[in-house]
Regions:
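N-proximal low-complexity "stem/linker" segments adjacent to membrane-targeting elements
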Residues: 1-33
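Conserved nucleotide-sugar donor-binding catalytic segment
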Residues: 16, 124, 143-238
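Short, acidic, metal-binding catalytic loop of nucleotide-sugar glycosyltransferases
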Residues: 32-41
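Short beta-strand/loop segment that forms part of the nucleotide-sugar
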Residues: 41-50, 68-71
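A conserved acidic beta->alpha catalytic loop
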Residues: 48-57, 95
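Glycine-rich, basic loop-to-helix element that forms the pyrophosphate-binding segment
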Residues: 70-86, 96
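Short aromatic/hydrophobic "clamp" motif used to bind/position activated sugar donors
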Residues: 91-92
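Conserved donor NDP-sugar-binding/catalytic core segment of glycosyltransferases
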Residues: 104-138
């Protein structure tokens, strides 16, 4: 039997959840990239939204999968179904058109989360892929040479940049994901874009991420992908998320909220007092400056833009 070892898993440590809707073209590659992981104590759950393109026939080819196929109310509904089915201690999300490049990623996540009790989420870098399978640029490639802050120090970076962790590879403690993932009572923009809601809750409730400077998964560009289909809804949701982070930063620095840090069991490990708040604010300003467009633009490009602007001004004056 194909993947017989995965069929025999009864107490999975890792649960992989994959929402799916009419993307049979990419489904086999996604399933097999997950099944190629060196770590074998995992389950793979596919929540199909009632596809009509042959998806179900493909799912039946893989006896190790746990899957259902029925209409979903929305993306959030699909993820909530998956969370109810997941039995693992840790959860990884993998969209139906995406997959993994690093076969040792699950191994690394289980090891790191086992050794770092203060960490609730492990993440790395994704790489874009074309519809026909050609690898393109690496997202956030600069982090390979200049990694973002780790654990508690990530808070100031997040407040300054509103950075959203790449959900296509991060591995989260299941209890933390369930606690912080939006449900039907969440604010509307977090029901629309549930990963933003998780990110906001995860950070404001004091959980800590750990970055691994490796490229571990691919995210595929293709016609009809979620980002294209839902752009009109998700872009306003993202703007509201950015505003929420900005408001939280202001409340924290004015002393209107008390921020605590938590370990992977949700226990409070420390509280941000006035002294710590000043340090976080100092780091916040540093990250704002370092991540500014001005410093991330090559000097020659800035010079050309400045020269062009000057010429436009003088040209306008001459025309008058």
């Amino acid at each position: 039997m194909r993947y017989a070892d995965l069929c025999s898993v009864t107490e999975p440590v890792v649960s992989v959840i994959t929402p799916s809707l009419n993307h049979a073209k990419f489904l086999r590659a996604t399933i097999e990239s997950v099944a190629a992981q060196t770590y074998r104590n995992f389950e793979h759950i596919v929540i199909d939204g009632g596809s009509s393109d042959g998806t179900v026939e493909i799912l039946k080819e893989y006896p190790h999968l746990k899957w259902i196929s029925e209409p979903d109310d929305n993306v959030l509904d699909a993820y909530q179904k998956a969370l109810r089915l997941a039995r693992g201690r840790y959860i990884i999300q993998c969209c139906v058109s995406d997959g993994f490049l690093a076969p040792g990623w699950f191994d690394k996540c289980v090891d790191l989360l086992g050794r770092h009790k203060d960490v609730s989420l492990v993440w790395a870098l994704p790489q874009y892929m074309s519809e026909d399978g050609a690898l393109l640029r690496v997202s956030y490639e600069g982090f390979l040479e200049d990694p973002p802050p780790q654990k508690e120090d990530f808070l100031s970076f997040w407040l300054a940049t509103r950075f959203v962790l790449p959900e296509g590879n991060y591995c989260v403690r299941a209890s933390v994901l369930r606690e912080n993932f939006p449900d039907g009572n969440a604010r509307e923009h977090y029901r629309i874009h549930c990963h933003l809601g998780f990110m906001y809750n995860f950070m404001t409730r004091g959980y800590c991420p750990l970055f691994v400077p490796e490229v571990v998964n691919y995210g595929r560009f293709h016609a009809g992908q979620r980002g294209q289909r839902l752009q009109a809804e998700e872009r306003p949701a993202y703007k509201k998320y950015v505003n929420d982070v900005r408001l939280y930063a202001g409340q924290l620095f004015r002393g209107e909220v008390v921020h605590v840090f938590r370990d992977g069991e949700s226990a409070v490990t420390s509280t941000v007092d006035a002294r710590a708040s000043r340090r976080i604010r100092k780091d916040y300003r540093k990250h704002q400056l370092l991540q500014s467009r001005l410093l991330r633009t090559a000097p020659y490009v800035l010079f050309v833009k400045f020269r062009t602007k000057v010429r436009q001004v003088f040209s306008a004056k001459t025309e008058r």
